[in-house]
């Protein structure tokens, strides 16, 4: 094996960061760097506010879980599922082939008394539980377990998540002397699905910067 790059989008970025902090010698070979894709790191008063929302069970009213728990999960067929998502604001900007892949691998046919229908391949309750348990303690975790690998960040130019969370802690992690480690791609929080080719190119540039 070889040292690994950890690359994650949204929650995947947070998990990559947590893994790098807690397990710097991952697999016995170490971690070369962490690349966050629109995963602005929460710290300060915003982190404490999220912690309070989780403690008081109010997090479900402010997290994406308020949408996922009511997400439609069945359609007559795959084309109907595609058409449904294609007209949803969050999915309408996706590259069509990416959305087709989402339907192909994120849904499946289910046999029912009337024949077959297309259903989600994941449970809404699990998705909602994930949203409602977003980490609020990253700042404290990183103080206890300082990162031993460099960090880079790629964000969407129209990302609401970046605006809501702020970028102060992310800037501290990336550092001021590495402009190649803070990149932007046109699009929303879901820019990897909206502009996959541009995202792949940005990932390559960011990893090259981390390797220097």
Locations of regions flagged by a protein language model:
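Short aromatic-enriched loop/helix-cap "lid" or pocket-rim segments at secondary-structure transitions
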Residues: 45-50, 165-167, 195-196
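Catalytic histidine-centered segment of alpha/beta-hydrolase-like enzymes
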Residues: 184-200
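Conserved loop-alpha-helix segment in the C-terminal half of the alpha/beta-hydrolase fold
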Residues: 142-187
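Active-site loop signature of alpha/beta-hydrolase-fold enzymes
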Residues: 42, 161, 190
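Alpha/beta-hydrolase
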Residues: 67-158
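Short, flexible helix-coil linker/hinge segments at the edges of structured domains or between repeats
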Residues: 39-67
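Conserved hydrolase catalytic core segment
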Residues: 2-49
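C-terminal alpha-helix
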Residues: 202-210
């Amino acid at each position: 094996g070889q040292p690994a790059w950890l690359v994650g989008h949204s929650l995947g970025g947070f998990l990559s960061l947590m893994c790098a902090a807690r397990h710097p010698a991952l697999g016995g070979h170490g971690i070369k760097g962490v690349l966050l894709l629109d995963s602005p790191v929460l710290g300060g008063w915003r982190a404490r506010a999220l912690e309070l929302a989780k403690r008081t069970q109010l997090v479900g009213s402010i997290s994406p879980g308020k949408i996922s728990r009511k997400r439609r999960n069945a359609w007559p067929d795959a084309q109907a599922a595609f058409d449904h998502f294609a007209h949803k604001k969050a999915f309408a900007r996706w590259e069509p082939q990416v959305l087709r892949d989402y339907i192909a691998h994120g849904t499946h046919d289910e046999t029912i008394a009337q024949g077959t229908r297309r259903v989600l391949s994941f449970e809404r309750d699990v998705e909602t539980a994930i949203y409602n348990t977003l980490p609020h303690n990253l700042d404290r975790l990183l103080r206890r377990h300082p990162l031993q690998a460099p960090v880079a960040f790629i964000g969407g130019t129209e990302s609401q998540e970046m605006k809501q969370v702020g970028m102060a802690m992310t800037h501290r992690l990336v550092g001021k002397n590495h402009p190649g480690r803070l990149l932007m791609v046109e699009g929303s929080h879901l820019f990897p699905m909206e502009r996959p080719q541009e995202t792949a190119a940005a990932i390559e540039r960011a990893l090259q910067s981390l390797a220097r």
